[in-house]
Amino acid sequence: MENGKVHVASMSGLSMPHMNEMLEK
């Protein structure tokens, strides 16, 4: 699941902060 999220963030390019929030939740 984490890998998938990382992939989505990499594709977005600007989901770095968003990913952190998702990981925290």
Swiss-Prot record:
* Taxonomy, superkingdom: Eukaryota
Which residue ranges are recorded for the region named Disordered?
1-25
What is the protein name stated in its UniProt record?
A: Unknown protein 7
| Source species | Pseudotsuga menziesii (Douglas-fir)
